[in-house]
């Protein structure tokens, strides 16, 4: 694995390497360094943590919530909604977004120990299925990584490569064949044609240092990078989508996500801002599921 050389170097740095510090006289000391965070897209992190990940019964790397699937529709993909479908009852407060059953570092080791002690392959697979943990995580030799807390969700992949493009597809009525159900958040194609033209015009005179030229979002999104989605959603969408939804609540919901994204991009956050951000994220997700 390409991670092996990095772990080898991490082991050496944990033991320490000789270094010199220049003041009036050179003074020798032992330099140590530890990796405490790891970032990557969803699939890469799932492999690094040794978890089953998306589509598993316990897909989340941060909590132990059990996924559900549309059995009647023949779906095999598990997902974790806060509002459970009919026929799925929560146990206790497991669906309380302000009090999720979070994983802790020890959960990983306990699951691995249980699998190691399993007497049969079937027993081992059952433990893996019920915990969502497949195998030992990477970077386990030094011990500086907390498997439950040191691997946060990557902002770019979570928002710009997932949530934002999917929202646009939902608003276009082109997301996996889903209609709007009892809601009415679809924006008509003729309106999207106008939005696409305005997107092109909006970036025509903006210096390239801020954003590259954007194509017609209604016709061609293949060239939209994470940077493109970020600029379009945070700076253009609040103007381009104003008055375009049939009901104002969808526009306000979009603005709430814009505010969340802007806040999370700040270089520093106070404890009060973090608490406020948590409340706003929970509110956004709950309104999305409605």
Question: Which functions belong to the PLM regions below?
Answer:
Residues 8-238:
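Charged (Asp/Glu and Lys/Arg) segments that form or flank catalytic channels of large polymer-
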Residues 62, 231-242, 253-263:
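Short, hydrophobic/amphipathic alpha-helical patches that form generic packing surfaces
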